[in-house]
């Protein structure tokens, strides 16, 4: 499946690819099941809050009908006195905030009918989520001017492994029903996070 959405601001948007597969196999006494899903998402956003790259903040709080983003020669205007000359269109042209997210969710299960309605089920599942974010504040923008450019990287990996063991039995005796279930479950969760930034760049980054 494919999804693409355009944001309400010039450089914002969302794109996603999703794939899914399911397999089931049944024999006389054994049921095998396997499921897998993979998603790749790319998201472009404007910085929010009170940053100079926040167009919503600028337009709603500081811009007026006399404000113009471009000069007559096509260059960016600095006629934004309330923002100390910061032009939000110039800022969003040079700055970026991009995130790529990969997620995998897979599971396998085997159910064995031992005798009559006595069943043993073993299941294992793994959920992995990876986030990779890149943020650039250009020296030509007010966000990065004082530091001569700021580049930030945020990386996070989340992994969760689950296993389940279930022994179940059900039986009907006339008007009576008997159900019994014994189970055991384990969970292993890991999270890795890395943040890094740098400034004082000798040139502009693309």
Region locations from a protein language model:
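Residue-level recognition of beta-strand termini and adjacent short loop/turns
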Residues: 28, 113-115
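Transmembrane beta-strand segments that form the barrel wall of outer-membrane beta-barrel proteins
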Residues: 1-4
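A cytosolic small-molecule/anion-sensing beta-strand core signal
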Residues: 106
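An active-site-proximal structural segment forming one wall of the substrate-binding cleft
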Residues: 118
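Surface-exposed loop/interface segments of Gram-negative outer-membrane beta-barrel transport/assembly proteins
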Residues: 7-12, 18, 22-103, 123-206
């Amino acid at each position: 499946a494919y999804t693409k959405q355009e944001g309400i601001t010039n450089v914002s948007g969302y794109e996603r690819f999703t794939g899914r597969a399911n397999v089931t196999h049944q024999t006389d006494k054994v049921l095998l099941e396997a499921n897998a899903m993979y998603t790749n998402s790319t998201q472009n956003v404007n910085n929010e809050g009170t940053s100079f790259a926040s167009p919503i903040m600028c337009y709603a709080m500081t811009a007026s009908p006399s404000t113009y983003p471009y000069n007559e020669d096509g260059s960016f205007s600095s006629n934004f006195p309330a923002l100390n000359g910061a032009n939000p269109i110039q800022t969003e042209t040079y700055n970026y905030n991009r995130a790529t997210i990969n997620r995998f969710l897979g599971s396998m299960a085997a159910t064995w009918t031992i005798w009559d309605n006595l069943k043993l089920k073993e299941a294992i599942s793994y959920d992995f989520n990876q986030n990779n974010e890149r943020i650039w504040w250009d020296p030509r923008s007010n966000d990065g001017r004082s530091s001569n450019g700021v580049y930030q990287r945020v990386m996070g990996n989340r992994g969760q492994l689950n296993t389940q063991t279930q022994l179940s039995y059900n039986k009907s005796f006339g008007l009576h029903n008997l159900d019994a279930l014994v189970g055991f479950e384990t969970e292993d969760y890991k999270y890795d996070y890395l943040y890094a930034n740098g400034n004082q760049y000798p040139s502009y980054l693309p």
